[in-house]
């Protein structure tokens, strides 16, 4: 299992808009609870949804999988991650719907062989005999670091005018876009051991041997696709609101047991993660427990970690293990 917590310093972004009200395009916000010197408080803060991060990850996986010669479905090739949710989608992809629950494993394997994105990112067929595959990549909301009384985040609407050099009614318009600046954090988990492995119970079906043959390539592609998230290549409205973005720090662990690093709110999150990792290895009788750190803000990282300089170095390390 590969898991991580990440900190980005992001200035002037509009990566996750949610709606337009008149001439105002709003940024996504959500309530968070934080502990302050006076007790627990609720605050609404700018956020970037896990769906936005997952879309960027899967789009990156499409490009990487094609280069690796792995199968990508017709809809996924268009970066439309409807996958195999409806009968209409099955017709487009050339997959026969499941007859009943006993046919679910056959259906899941055929879908996985057709589209590596459905293998890694999961899918939910909602027809007469529903079949679900849980995503092997898990992503939460990207939220500001919760650091005591002050949250390092701010929203403000920026004024713009669409200019016209001719006096035509409606051609020159005012519009406002909410932008955010924040010290953002997010966490992720990639269960690479379960990639190319059917999740539906039942006897082995045709095609599983081919999945086993492709597994190494599929895992490699899934790890490479993390690069888009760790390098900040995600979100929308980038053509005119490309943010000033810097990776401040991260900790990524690779284990053979379930483990999630500390959220990147406090400055000791890496040190605490390393301390917990050693204890978790003992509690769960683990054999593999490695930690990789990038530290561009001079915080404590603890002992027994591999400190790297760049995200590129990190991805290479994860592939090698």
From Swiss-Prot:
Miscellaneous information on this protein: Crystallography and cloning were done with strain P2, while interaction experiments were done with genes cloned from strain P2 but over-expressed in P1. The aCascade complex was purified from strain P1.
Superkingdom, natural source: Archaea
Keywords for the protein's UniProt record, in alphabetical order: Antiviral defense, RNA-binding
Molecular function (Gene Ontology), one example: RNA binding
Family according to the record: Belongs to the CRISPR-associated protein Cas7/Cst2/DevR family. Subtype I-a/Apern subfamily.
Function: CRISPR (clustered regularly interspaced short palindromic repeat) is an adaptive immune system that provides protection against mobile genetic elements (viruses, transposable elements and conjugative plasmids). CRISPR clusters contain spacers, sequences complementary to antecedent mobile elements, and target invading nucleic acids. CRISPR clusters are transcribed and processed into CRISPR RNA (crRNA).
Name under which the protein is recorded: CRISPR-associated aCascade subunit Cas7/Csa2 2
Pfam families: DevR (PF01905)
CDD domains the UniProt entry points to: Cas7_I-A
One GO process term, biological-process aspect: defense response to virus
Organism this protein belongs to: Saccharolobus solfataricus (strain ATCC 35092 / DSM 1617 / JCM 11322 / P2)
Record InterPro entries: Cas7/Cst2/DevR_sub_I-a/Apern, CRISPR-assoc_Cas7/Cst2/DevR, CRISPR-Cas7/Cst2/DevR
Classification via NCBIfam families: cas_MJ0381 (TIGR01875), DevR_archaea (TIGR02583)
Name of the gene: csa2b
Subunit structure: Part of the aCascade ribonucleoprotein complex, minimally composed of Csa2 and Cas5a, which binds crRNA. Other possible components of aCascade in strain P1 are Cas6b (SSO1437) and Csa5 (SSO1443), while SSO1399, Cas5b (SSO1400) and SSO1401 have sometimes been seen weakly associated. Csa2 is probably the major RNA-binding subunit. The Csa2-Cas5a-crRNA complex also binds target DNA homologous to crRNA, probably forming an R-loop. Purified aCascade forms a filament about 6 nm in width.
